[in-house]
Amino acid sequence: MVIKTSLTVLILGVLIAEVFCAGHSQCNRRENPVNPFSYYETVNGKETLRMCPAAQIFNKTSCHCNAVEVVPGSGMNFRSGQQNFQWSSSGSSGGGMGASGMGANGMVASGIGASGIGTSGMGASNTNAMMNAFLGGSKAGSGNIATSGTSSGKFKVTLPFNPLILKWTKSSNGGWGAETGSSGGMNSQSSGSQSGSWGSSSGSWGGSSGSMGSSGNWLNDLQFMGNMRPQGINFPAPIMNIKVSGTGGSSQGVLRAARPHP
């Protein structure tokens, strides 16, 4: 009788434990080693790749996507050991980033040059480990990048988790386009951005009036959204979140980037 009672209690205990654990199962998600903005989820034995919401990365500890951290201070820092850089819209005669822009603050030794981008500004042999851009042209034309010079190239951003190449082509009005951008601008769609600029209809990286934010401010939250075909492959997830802040005109602005939590 005692054995029967003990066996009944044991069975009931196992059933209760199973019911309890069913609502508290282990995380059925795992991180994506290639892209922290996504994760793999297993449901009914089938594993599916899922994307986190914009500007969030998967946290294996919480088993959820969490917001990324905005790097404080000026410049852009992906923990590459390089100096942060700043840019300024002053010092350029025809648009572009200006003589007192990136070069003077740690991006490249010879800088962008007084005439805009410059042929030896962001060249292949004179960049740091964080950013490597291949841009042509003697100046930034009417405010766009490389309106004259080479018609194609690549913009390489080295992230701590995966090197990434964003291809660009010179479009009809000289912006950065993403493969087939028809109206210029570095955009999130392969068909071209709405206004030929980086998220601003009045300027900001290639507006008709000149350099960065020369007519209007730079308070734009921008994202590389993946259709920019890194390494020729559609990448259906945000790559990084960039905030450009400043007051417009010839004032100096600050480029800040989001990064994952350590």
From Swiss-Prot:
Keywords: Glycoprotein, Secreted, Signal. It is found in: Secreted. Residues 185-203 have a biased composition (Low complexity). Residues 1-21 form the signal peptide. GO terms for cellular component: extracellular region. Component of the acid-insoluble and acid-soluble organic matrix of calcified layers of the shell (at protein level). Residues 172-212 are annotated as: Disordered. Residues 174-184 have a biased composition (Gly residues). Glycans are attached at residue 59. This is Glycine and serine-rich protein 1. It comes from Lottia gigantea (Giant owl limpet). The lineage of its organism: Eukaryota, Metazoa, Spiralia, Lophotrochozoa, Mollusca.
